[in-house]
């Protein structure tokens, strides 16, 4: 699309890439005249302002010159990275002079803008170029084969690259090499190009076209490959661009024939080596890919020829073209619309003729508005492929599972004269781990669950606890896996039975501290864990003494006592007891406040009386522990849990642990935990977790922990999940409860935990921790993603079906079985379609013996004669990598009907039967000999394509020869009678020849090439073509061997993969182009064994259209 234009008949030069803003210098051309036939000359500098929508370029400065110019370049001499200095303008004049201008002075309007000039050349200077490595070096070319190298630091004395070429001729083009700073190339209209080495001061190679019709109008070096260059021809009879490689200078590497008439100028983009501009006498400006010859873009131009074309160094999408109609146009290869250009033409027309009626009526002229109304939008398409500078050099994207996918387009470093730089497209998949401690703790938890080592895991957590509360929680969790869990809970609450016994004993003053210590079995135990005999005797004596002291307080059984029946309380109690009225006796005792007597009598009166008495007692008693005693006696623990002061939550929990029944234990602990959780005190809220642990209530533990702890950090969530997992395992082991069903809150936490694990790359662990029995959409979606990330089938989804149906190969038809001493039939002059002549009797086919196939198929008895037809071959056999070459000794016959059965040849008395294809597939697995069979199977006349036949060696049966002998695979010649003889041939030890497998990334090459050959063979009718394809199939083994050994360079393997992709898309022309590229850019000795035959295969495939 056109961006700007300047109405000048001039040579052009862009400002260097370091300069900003972008300038375009123009110098009056010495080859053309403008429409005014003016003889004045000038230098002008225009600014490129792409923000301005108009087509006009702003003129910054004009310098009137006395010279007209054949060539103009703008070099970056003495410029820094900031572009403060504008470099130097170098102009080639028509009188052999070279003038150096200061652009900054021209822009500033100074009069003295010439830095230096020299007229050493003879004739006009048509060729100029600046060395990109040493910007002070400028090469120039003129008539009489004159080439000078100018040093801008010492402009007075130039040097020559060597002796002048003979015969003398004009120098039309000159260019410095883009990779090697001392290499220079020049070209002349005669079609000859010369490459100079400034270090040797002589030409090193000359390139010319053999047709002698190549009139060089353009020369350009490859931006990346030091040995490649292009030459353009101005001759209308040969309007081509030739791409040469100096390593193969006998003929052009590639010829671009996109122009219809001679080419006037070319320019190779430094930003993208796949963009080559060319303009010719056919009034076309084409942007082509020199590597493929494809035209990527055609600029919309007028019918005028362009004599100069250049890329903008700073903006790689912009180019300029100078045409013979006196206009310099600036274009963009990124496409756009030409509506602005059309509108400008309409505006010019209107301004020239006016838009009012010339007769003064003041009415607008309708015809001038009609083109504007009927005009359609014209869109110019951009390049067919994205240019290199807009391709992302690097990129990154996060994916599920903590994967970081990054790519980078790495250009391999080039060397002098080395291969073409290859753009290596690398994609890296990295695992990003940000929470290493989180993963470590998660791994420890998984190991504890898998090994069932919960006690040791809890102990480690206790030892590592930094707070007392954390230590208590893990201690409570540990108790779940130990014996006497309730007793251990009491100990954790501070109620140790041994310590309580000591306190009670001291309170009763029965024994001193020393005796208490003796009564404690733990204290008197010896170091080996057993009690000493002395300790046992002492304890026994103490027990007898206590019983004796207690018996002294009982009333004496001897003597008499008085039974009073008076009218006082005692007498009434006595009368009630004598009559068996326990209820009245108890009432009298309660009335007299004799509580102990009432309880004793109530016990004798039965449970019902005792219960009523206890209630009356508790109603009258007002001590501090009455409610506790009431709960103990009445077993009303819910009252204690609901009514106790929460400061005594430990005591309430201890009472529940001591007395509660298993069926009510969990509910009471939950009730106490709920009271603590609902209390405003944060300390009590955290203690509720201990109650929920005792109850085994995972859901409430999660809810309570979430309220009390900060769950935003991954380690905080890890703390919770560790407790939840251990508690669930404890409930599962101790209470035999189903823990698979989870609540909403727990499922959310487990899902969050699984997400964190997946984000750290632990997909399997995340899948293991994810709840199973839940229908929550987010969890089901996460499970689906985890299964897919791990490559496992997703529950509820069918596996993708195989797009083809597996077919079982048919079993071989049964062969004839000969009886004992049965003589074979003699058949003469037999032939077999597609078969081979068997060798004469006694000839051992070593190539058909597979040492690993022993014992795979049954064999015939030793005294039976078996008749076996030769192995049928639908086509020339394709040898496997470990098979010897097949020998075709019989000329091919016409194809027989499918139902044609070949006659059975005469064979030796002992013959190896051929097994069915399924048995042949098992020949790589050694096994024990199979028992003898009286039948053998023959294969069907056809086997699937690509399956190779391997000879089979079998052990003999009991009726055959001894085990130390082996049967040779012997076939008789057709028609030759064979006697009833045996040949005992001892098998020689053979060593299996093995090759490395082809790497998986290159296996597609073998599959693609072999499949292409098979398709060609099935379509080819010419015997000569089939022989070529057969030979190609064998010689491609050299390629496969190199792939196995991985001795090919990355450039070659990458090119082979490109060829394989072109074969898959049936684009054989592209494959041949890539083949030429590989051959021209690689070492010949590395590819000579297989690349010629690969070209044969591609050519035949293209010819056959398979």
UniProtKB/Swiss-Prot annotation:
Ranges where the record places region Interaction with SEC13: 161-471
Modified residues (Phosphoserine): 527, 532, 799, 1049
Protein name: Protein transport protein Sec31A
Keyword annotations: Cytoplasm, Cytoplasmic vesicle, Endoplasmic reticulum, ER-Golgi transport, Isopeptide bond, Membrane, Phosphoprotein, Protein transport, Repeat, Transport, Ubl conjugation, WD repeat
Subcellular location per the Swiss-Prot or TrEMBL entry: Cytoplasm; Cytoplasmic vesicle, COPII-coated vesicle membrane; Endoplasmic reticulum membrane
Stretches with biased composition (Polar residues): 917-939
Family named by the database record: Belongs to the WD repeat SEC31 family.
Comment block on domains: The ALG-2-binding site motif-2 (ABS-2) contains a PXPGF sequence that binds hydrophobic pocket 3 of PDCD6.
Record's bilayer topology term: Peripheral membrane protein
GO cellular component: COPII vesicle coat; COPII-coated ER to Golgi transport vesicle; endoplasmic reticulum exit site; endoplasmic reticulum membrane
């Amino acid at each position: 699309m056109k961006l700007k234009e300047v109405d000048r008949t001039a040579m052009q030069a862009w400002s260097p890439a370091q300069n900003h803003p972008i300038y375009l210098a123009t110098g009056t051309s010495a080859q053309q005249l403008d429409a005014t036939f003016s003889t004045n000359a000038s230098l002008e500098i225009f600014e490129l302002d792409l923000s301005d929508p108009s087509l006009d370029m702003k003129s910054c400065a004009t310098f009137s010159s006395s010279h007209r110019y054949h060539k103009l370049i703008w070099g970056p001499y003495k410029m820094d990275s900031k572009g403060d200095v504008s470099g130097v303008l170098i102009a080639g004049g028509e009188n052999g002079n070279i003038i150096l201008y200061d652009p900054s002075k021209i822009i500033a309007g100074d009069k003295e803008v010439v830095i230096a000039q020299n007229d050493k050349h003879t004739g006009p200077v048509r060729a100029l170029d600046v060395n990109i490595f040493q910007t002070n070096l400028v090469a120039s070319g003129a008539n009489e084969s004159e080439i000078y190298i100018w040093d801008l630091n010492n402009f007075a004395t130039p040097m020559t690259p060597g002796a002048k070429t003979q015969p003398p001729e004009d120098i039309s083009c000159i260019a410095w090499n883009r990779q090697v700073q001392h290499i220079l190339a020049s070209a002349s209209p005669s079609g000859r190009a010369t490459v100079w080495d400034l270090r040797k001061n002589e030409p090193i190679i000359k390139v010319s076209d053999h047709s002698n019709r190549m009139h060089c109008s353009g020369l350009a070096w490859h931006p990346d490959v030091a040995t490649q260059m292009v030459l353009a021809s101005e001759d209308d009879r040969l309007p081509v661009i030739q791409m040469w490689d100096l390593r193969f200078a006998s003929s052009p590497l590639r010829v671009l024939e996109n122009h219809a008439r001679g080419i006037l100028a070319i320019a190779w983009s430094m930003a993208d080596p796949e963009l080559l501009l060319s303009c010719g006498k056919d009034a076309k400006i084409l942007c082509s890919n020199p590597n493929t010859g494809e035209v990527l873009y055609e600029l919309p131009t007028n019918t005028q020829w362009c004599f100069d074309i250049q890329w903008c160094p700073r903006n790689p999408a912009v180019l300029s073209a100078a045409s013979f109609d006196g206009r310099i146009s600036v274009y963009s290869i990124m496409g756009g619309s030409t509506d602005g250009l059309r509108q400008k033409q309409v505006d010019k027309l209107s301004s020239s003729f006016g838009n009012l009626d010339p007769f003064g009526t003041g009415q607008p002229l309708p015809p001038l508005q009609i083109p504007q109304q009927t005009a359609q939008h014209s869109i110019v398409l951009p390049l067919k492929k994205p240019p290199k500078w807009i391709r992302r050099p690097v990129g990154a994207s996060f994916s599920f599972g903590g994967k970081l996918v990054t790519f980078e387009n790495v250009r391999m470093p080039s060397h002098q004269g080395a291969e073409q730089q290859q753009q290596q497209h690398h994609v890296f998949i990295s695992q990003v781990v940000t929470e290493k401690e989180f993963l470590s703790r998660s791994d420890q938890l998984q190991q504890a669950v898998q090994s069932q080592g919960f006690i040791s895991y809890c102990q480690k957590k206790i030892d590592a606890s930094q707070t007392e509360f954390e230590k208590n929680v893990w201690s409570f969790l540990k108790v779940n896996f130990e014996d006497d869990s309730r007793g251990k809970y009491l100990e954790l609450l501070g109620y140790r039975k041994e310590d309580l016994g000591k306190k009670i004993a001291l309170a009763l003053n029965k024994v001193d501290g020393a005796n208490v210590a003796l009564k404690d079995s733990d204290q008197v135990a010896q170091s080996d864990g057993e009690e000493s005999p002395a300790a046992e005797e002492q304890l026994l004596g103490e027990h007898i003494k206590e019983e004796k002291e207690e018996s002294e307080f009982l009333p004496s059984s001897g003597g008499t006592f008085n039974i009073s029946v008076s009218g006082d309380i005692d007498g009434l109690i006595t009368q009630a007891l004598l009559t068996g009225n326990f209820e009245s006796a108890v009432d009298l005792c309660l009335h007299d406040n004799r509580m102990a007597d009432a309880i004793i009598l109530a016990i004798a009166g039965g449970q019902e009386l005792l219960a009523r008495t206890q209630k009356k007692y508790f109603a009258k008693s007002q001590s501090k522990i009455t409610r506790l005693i009431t709960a103990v006696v009445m077993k009303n623990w819910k009252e204690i849990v609901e009514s106790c002061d929460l400061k005594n939550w430990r005591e309430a929990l201890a009472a529940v642990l001591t007395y509660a029944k298993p069926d009510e234990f969990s509910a009471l602990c939950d009730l106490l935990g709920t009271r603590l959780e609902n209390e405003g005190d944060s300390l009590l809220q955290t203690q509720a977790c201990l109650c929920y642990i005792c109850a085994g209530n995972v859901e409430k533990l999660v809810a309570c922990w979430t309220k009390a702890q900060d769950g935003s950090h991954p380690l905080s969530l890890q703390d919770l999940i560790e407790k939840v997992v251990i508690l669930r395992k404890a409930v599962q082991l101790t209470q035999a409860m189903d823990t698979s069903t989870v609540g909403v809150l727990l499922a959310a936490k487990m899902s969050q935990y699984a997400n964190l694990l997946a984000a750290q790359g632990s997909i399997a662990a995340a899948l293991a921790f994810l709840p199973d029995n839940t229908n929550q959409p987010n969890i089901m979606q996460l499970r689906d993603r985890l299964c897919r990330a791990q490559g496992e089938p997703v529950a509820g989804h069918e596996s993708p079906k195989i797009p083809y149906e597996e077919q079982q190969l048919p079993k071989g038809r049964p062969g004839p079985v000969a009886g004992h001493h049965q003589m074979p039939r003699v058949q003469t002059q037999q032939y077999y379609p597609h078969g081979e002549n068997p060798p004469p009797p006694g000839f051992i086919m070593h190539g058909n013996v597979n040492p690993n196939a022993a014992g795979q198929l049954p064999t015939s008895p030793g005294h039976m004669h078996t008749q076996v037809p030769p192995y049928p071959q639908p086509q020339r056999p394709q040898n496997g990598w470990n098979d010897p070459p097949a020998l075709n000794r019989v000329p091919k016959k016409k194809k027989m009907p499918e139902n044609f059965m070949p006659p059975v040849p005469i064979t030796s008395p002992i013959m190896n039967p051929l097994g069915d294809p399924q048995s042949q597939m098992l020949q790589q697995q050694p096994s024990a000999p199979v028992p003898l069979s009286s039948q053998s199977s023959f294969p069907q006349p056809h086997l699937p394509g690509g399956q190779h036949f391997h000879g089979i060696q079998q052990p003999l049966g009991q009726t055959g020869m001894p085990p130390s002998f082996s049967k040779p695979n012997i076939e008789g010649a057709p028609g030759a009678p064979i006697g009833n003889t045996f040949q005992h041939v001892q098998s020689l030890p053979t060593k299996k020849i093995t090759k490395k497998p082809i790497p998986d990334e290159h296996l597609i090459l073998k599959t693609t090439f072999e499949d292409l050959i098979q398709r060609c063979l099935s379509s080819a009718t010419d015997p000569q073509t089939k022989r070529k394809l057969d030979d190609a199939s064998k010689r491609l083994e050299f390629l496969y061997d190199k792939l196995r050994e991985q001795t090919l360079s990355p450039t070659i393997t990458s090119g082979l993969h490109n060829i394989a992709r072109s074969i898959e898309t049936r684009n054989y022309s592209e494959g041949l182009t890539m083949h030429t590229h590989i051959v021209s850019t690689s070492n010949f000795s590395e590819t000579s064994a297989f690349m010629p035959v690969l070209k044969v295969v591609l050519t035949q495939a293209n010819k056959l259209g398979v």
